């Protein structure tokens, strides 16, 4: 069995002072993916002797960034999706393993008044093309902060957020297209009707205390691996970021 964890840490240096290493050891994942590390190369040295470490950094300092820590050494590693326009912000890492590709992604936020939505749509199209090109070789699992609540059940206040970044019709439609292309939202695969299961809460309104949240962190799994998928969960008990970790286990 393999346990995979994904967590948007909203700044790894900040979360290091909030029990990150204790949480990391307790969760004991075979593969641990991070988004929004907000680091440049050499700014942090994590002592993880049981893990191979892979980091992708944004050109812009203190922004975006991803990392993957894995107990099994991958066959190959790719940073970005091979399109320069989309590879400036350290948003994607791909590891190839014998039975699957594992990708972590930090999808661009469409921002206030949806001012970055046009770029977001371009990124979504390019990313889907990328995973489908890999899928021709072996099944794909991707995880991360996808910056979209797919259905109304995936956020506390859908009625007031239809024009908000993360719940626009355009963003939701792009995610539907991914699922229609042969992928599973792993959490909804097991819990199609479970309510108030969120992975992000705004800092501004003490939303986490009241569980006024959004589920925007996912493991998306190729339908080729459906029978291998054992469980999916959300670790709302883990603090330190405005997001919490999400998990799947696989019979691999």
How would you name each of these model-derived features?
Residues 38, 43-110:
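Structured beta-strand-rich core segments of catalytic domains in phosphoester-bond hydrolases
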Residues 82-83, 108-124, 159-164:
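Surface-exposed cleft-lining segments at the edges of enzyme active sites
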Residues 61-76, 205-227:
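Conserved beta strand-loop-helix elements of the APE1-like EEP
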Residues 71, 95-98, 222-223, 248-252:
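Active-site beta-strand termini and strand-to-loop segments that position acidic
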Residues 31, 52, 125-212, 216:
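Metal-dependent phosphoesterases centered on the DNase I-like endonuclease/exonuclease/phosphatase
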Residues 1-48, 52, 58, 63-64, ...:
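N-terminal, active-site-proximal structural segment of metallo-dependent hydrolase catalytic domains
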Residues 2-10, 99-111, 143:
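Active-site-proximal beta-strand elements of phosphoester/diester hydrolases
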Residues 8, 24-42, 102, 131-152, ...:
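Active-site beta-strand/loop signature of hydrolases that rely on acidic residues for catalysis
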């Amino acid at each position: 069995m393999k346990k995979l964890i994904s967590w948007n840490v909203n700044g790894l240096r900040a979360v290091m002072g909030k029990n990150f290493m204790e949480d990391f050891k307790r969760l004991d994942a075979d593969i641990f993916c991070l988004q929004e590390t907000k680091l440049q190369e050499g700014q942090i040295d994590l002592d993880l002797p049981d893990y191979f470490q892979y980091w992708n950094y944004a050109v812009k300092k203190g922004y975006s960034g991803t990392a993957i820590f894995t107990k099994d050494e991958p066959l190959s590693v790719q940073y970005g999706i091979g399109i320069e326009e989309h590879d400036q912000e350290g948003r994607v890492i791909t590891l190839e393993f014998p039975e699957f590709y594992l990708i972590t992604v930090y999808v661009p936020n469409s921002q206030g008044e949806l001012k970055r939505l046009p770029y977001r749509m371009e990124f979504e199209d390019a990313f889907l093309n990328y995973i489908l090109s890999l899928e021709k070789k072996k099944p794909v699992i991707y995880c991360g902060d996808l910056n979209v609540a797919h259905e109304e059940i995936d956020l506390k206040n859908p009625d007031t957020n239809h024009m908000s970044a993360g719940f626009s019709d355009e963003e939701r439609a792009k995610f539907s297209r991914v699922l229609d292309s042969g992928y599973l939202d792993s959490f909804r695969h097991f819990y199609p009707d479970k309510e108030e299961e969120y992975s992000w809460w705004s800092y501004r309104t003490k939303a986490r205390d009241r569980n006024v949240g959004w589920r925007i962190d996912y493991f998306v799994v190729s339908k080729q691996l459906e029978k291998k998928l054992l469980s999916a969960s959300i670790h709302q008990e883990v603090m330190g970021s405005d997001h919490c970790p999400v998990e799947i286990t696989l019979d691999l």
